Design a protein with these regions (language model features):
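Generic "edge-of-domain/loop-turn" microfeature
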Residues: 20, 53, 177, 326, ...
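Composition- and surface-driven signal marking solvent-exposed, interaction-prone regions
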Residues: 2-4, 322-323, 329-335, 422-425, ...
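Mature catalytic domains of secreted/periplasmic carbohydrate-active enzymes
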Residues: 22-367, 487-574
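Acidic/polar, compositionally biased interaction segments
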Residues: 366-492
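Generic cytosolic/nucleocytoplasmic N-terminal low-complexity/intrinsically disordered segments
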Residues: 1-4, 16, 163, 319, ...
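Bacterial Sec-dependent N-terminal signal peptides
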Residues: 1-23
Length: 574
């Protein structure tokens, strides 16, 4: 046996011993146990948000439909919608008996998830509204067995998923909006102790004891500490109860020190000491949002490419479906999953069980230029253009405006960094302050705005005011003194991956996100002369040469009829 294989065997034995050892309720003991390897190897899981909120299935265009009850609490447009459709006396609780799940077939779901290429499933067992999808004794008359479907959804789906050889897990909301003991977002956060002790902990243990889920994804932790949630007590108890394959996520409150990372609608993570999987919907909501436009949904090609980007950085993806109240997963969502599964049927060896290469990507600069009438944007979790990355992009606006003589107050509202320059003078740098004043003469003035988006939400608004003018968004721009076109000249730039790398035990994989018509050029170390290159899904070796620090793979001999993939093409080098 080779020395390298012996080391792998020793490491596996040590990890197995650590995972099976009794875990104490301390962060040190929990972290010493570590994480099961299966999760890092799996790469792909399915999230399911299905509940009472699936009856109204409504939110703003970018909103979370599963937060419907919170919208009623804050009197947002969901309350207006409910009163218009169901009447002023209608209550959220009245949706529960309307949730019939009359077309639900758990075996049908499990087959779809298996065909998607997923290795685990996460069902929302209880969201923040407190409604349980199992017969919880701690939610009398507010569970799926007594109301609505009249079925043990957690139990039936667990059985169906495990029959397909997939691992089953649950999402579980730590707090509740409707609890009689403590109402999340209403009662003081520091008063949550009784709720945790008498309701959350026993219900958590009831769920785990009944179904032994392999994955636990807790949520709603952010207003309290890990100590208040009794995180170490619950995690250690869960690990000791379920065993070596069990894994938890990282949402356990301030001070948590364990769990796989769960970036939400992001570009993922590039450096972490823990396993991670981005969680996201196929659209912009987790629960089904009937108000959501088609353009909010990822295309199949976008889904495949995004998944490759995450895996190349060492992570994975838990992609969400939002079934309708009748139990059917919308056909568009099914199509996306099946397309991803077909791609994995051809290219799975470059995904499952792989590790990051020493460089994740080959990057290319992307630029989009257009006119904008004003700087008044709330892209939320989107980008200004599909070609631009959702995180880490730059924007530059320039033009001219006219104004009467006055002293003006300018304001930039943004969650990131921006600068305002007028007539070559810096008026605002948001790192120093959000507002700035400038005395302007009557006439024309040059304006430039620079914006650096970091991650998550993307928002920028440019406003102005004076003693004679109320604060308002700046408008009526021109692109230059000699250019009559209205608006600002806008330029958006970012870098996007064009090739993703992964590595298996015996091969390096280059996943091309743009099809290389004649050749694929890779900036990697010089390979052994005996290396063979093959496009997955084909049988013939491709010619290659190495020159000036670059690998050139000749793809000119490939025919369209040779290709068995769309969206991304995997070149195996071994």
């Amino acid at each position: 046996m080779k020395a390298k294989n012996i080391l792998y065997l020793i490491a596996a034995l040590l990890l197995g011993k650590s995972l099976s050892a009794q875990v104490q309720s301390t962060w040190e003991s929990i972290n010493e146990r570590g994480y099961p390897q299966w999760f890092s190897d799996a790469k792909l899981g399915i999230f399911i948000h299905w509940g009472v909120y699936s009856v109204p299935a409504y939110a703003s265009l970018e909103g979370y439909a599963e937060w419907y009850y919170r919208g009623l609490m804050t009197n947002d447009d969901r309350k207006t919608f409910q009163e218009r459709i169901y009447g002023k006396n209608f209550q959220y609780e009245d949706f529960a008996p309307m949730w019939k799940a009359e077309l639900w077939n758990p075996d049908e779901w499990a087959e779809l998830f298996q065909k998607s290429g997923a290795k685990y499933v996460l069902l929302v067992s209880k969201h923040h509204d407190g409604f349980c999808l199992w017969p919880s004794q701690y939610a009398p008359k507010w569970n799926s067995v007594e109301l609505g479907p009249k079925r043990d959804i957690c139990g039936e789906l667990t059985e169906a998923v495990r029959k397909k050889g997939l691992k089953m897990g649950f999402y579980y909301s730590l707090p509740e909006w409707k609890s009689d003991i403590h109402r999340w977002y209403v009662d003081p956060d520091e008063n949550i102790g009784e709720y945790v002790d008498t309701h959350m902990i026993p219900q958590f243990k009831e769920l785990v004891t009944r179904y032994k889920p392999t994955v636990l994804f807790t949520d709603g932790e952010w207003r309290n500490t890990a100590e208040q949630w009794h995180a170490t007590e619950l995690i250690s108890w869960y690990y000791n109860t379920v065993g070596k394959d069990a894994i938890v996520n990282d949402r356990w409150g301030e001070g948590q020190q364990h769990g796989f990372r769960t970036p939400e609608y992001s570009a993922g993570i590039t450096l972490t000491d823990r396993p991670w999987a981005e969680c996201r919907g196929l659209g912009r909501s987790f629960g089904l949002n009937r108000n959501e436009p088609l353009e909010n949904y990822m295309t199949s090609d976008e889904l495949i490419r995004h998944f490759c980007v995450l895996v190349a950085a060492g992570g994975g993806m838990t992609v969400n479906v939002g079934p309708a109240a009748d139990g059917k997963i919308p056909l568009l969502q099914q199509e996306r999953l099946l397309d991803l599964g077909r791609w994995l049927d051809v290219n799975g060896e470059a995904i499952y069980g792989t590790r990051p290469y020493k460089k994740f990507y080959e990057m290319k600069p992307v630029k989009v230029a257009r006119s904008e009438q004003q700087i008044d944007f709330d892209w939320k979790r989107n980008s200004p253009d599909p070609a631009i990355s959702c995180d880490h992009f730059q924007a530059h606006w320039q033009g001219v405006f006219h104004c009467p003589a006055d002293t003006y107050t300018f304001e930039i509202q943004t969650d990131d960094q921006a600068r305002l320059v007028i007539d070559d003078k810096e008026v605002i740098d948001t790192q120093k302050g959000k507002t700035g004043k400038m005395k302007l003469a009557q006439g024309q003035h040059r304006i430039e705005v620079f914006y650096e988006e970091d991650d998550l939400e993307a928002t920028i608004h440019l406003l102005w005011s004076s003693k004679t003018m109320e604060k308002q968004v700046m408008t009526n721009f021109q692109q230059g003194a000699m250019l009559p076109a209205m608006g600002l000249k806008a330029t958006y730039t970012s870098e996007q991956p064009t090739v993703c790398y992964t590595q298996g035990k015996n091969a390096l994989y280059a996943i091309a996100l743009d099809y290389p018509e004649d050749q694929l050029i890779l900036n990697i170390d010089e390979p052994a002369p005996s290396m063979k290159v093959r496009l997955l899904g084909t049988v013939k070796d491709l010619p290659w040469k190495y020159k000036d620090g670059k690998l050139f793979i000749d793809t000119s001999g490939l025919k369209y009829s040779d290709l068995r993939s769309t969206a991304a093409w995997v070149f195996q080098m071994k």
